[in-house]
Amino acid sequence: MTISLEADLKSLQQSAQAAISGCDDLDGLDKLRVQYLGKKGELSLILKGMGKLSAEERPKFGAIANEVKEALQHDLESRKANLQNAAIEAQLAAETLDVTMAGSYRPQGRRHPLNSTVDRVLDIFVGLGYTVATGPQVETDYYNFEALNIPADHPARDMQDTFFLKDGRLLRTHTSPVQIRYMEKHDPPIRIVAPGRVYRRDTVDATHSAVFHQVELLAIDKGLAFTHLKGTIQAFIKQMFGEALPIRFRASYFPFTEPSAEVDVQWQGKWLEVMGCGMVDPNVMEAVGYDPEVYTGFAAGFGVERFAMVLHQIDDIRRLYNSDLRFLRQF
């Protein structure tokens, strides 16, 4: 009986070693491991015959079986290592770069002056404690006009100023609708800065574009006054231009702020109009459910293109949109 089982072990070892040496993939190698050494594998089937051996024969047969098992495990691990090394070498060969080949030129990109200006503005206001807010560019009449205290007969609704769509909606003419949407969803106090693209039916020339970018800021809290607005604008201008420039506030009119003002900055010997601002009109507060007897707020807005042109001494707004690499490479 022992001789028969030993012959079975020898036959199993020979067939297993032949199969292992001929296997050329890791999945197949794992299947061979299960076939020969698994719980229901061929070695286990042979070992079940040990129960028929005498007490003297079992230790001898058990030792031979362990030798066969260890030999097959060694062969499996050795073959696995060889296959893994071969796979790595094949991958390296496929990914090897010919360093003698001429490289392909990839020109270095640059930040567009409009993007860099917006980023600079947002960095300043985020540093002042403001949260960045955004909204849709296609707006409803309510958010673009009504909620901002702009009545139906206001000039801003004129077809010459606004792009109206067939379904009654429109392309937003300012980023102020973002403020309304934000206030509807948040209770005061709030401080937000809203950048975005806006649209107006302007004739395109050196200083006007039908599509341009705005940034607006809004602060709502108890006890805010015009002095807080002035301090915020002064802090922004100082960081934006790198110095404390002379600033003047001129009385103006905006339907959504009262009082309202235009802000001028003295830059290189000339006064430049840079933004509009004012205290939030009580009607706007009531439109979003805020109590104007409890809360006050201020808002300000400006064109990004104006700041980009001033900071980079650009003489024509159209240069910002014509994708001329000779121009863009300067930044």
Swiss-Prot record:
Chief location of this protein within or outside the cell: cytoplasm
One Gene Ontology MF term: ATP binding
Subunit structure: Tetramer of two alpha and two beta subunits.
Name of this protein: Phenylalanine--tRNA ligase alpha subunit
GO terms, biological process: phenylalanyl-tRNA aminoacylation
Swiss-Prot/TrEMBL catalytic activity: tRNA(Phe) + L-phenylalanine + ATP = L-phenylalanyl-tRNA(Phe) + AMP + diphosphate + H(+)
Keyword match Coiled coil: no
HAMAP family: Phe_tRNA_synth_alpha1 (MF_00281)
Keywords: Aminoacyl-tRNA synthetase, ATP-binding, Cytoplasm, Ligase, Magnesium, Metal-binding, Nucleotide-binding, Protein biosynthesis
Family as reported in the entry's similarity comment: Belongs to the class-II aminoacyl-tRNA synthetase family. Phe-tRNA synthetase alpha subunit type 1 subfamily.
Assigned GO CC terms: cytoplasm
Gene behind the chain: pheS
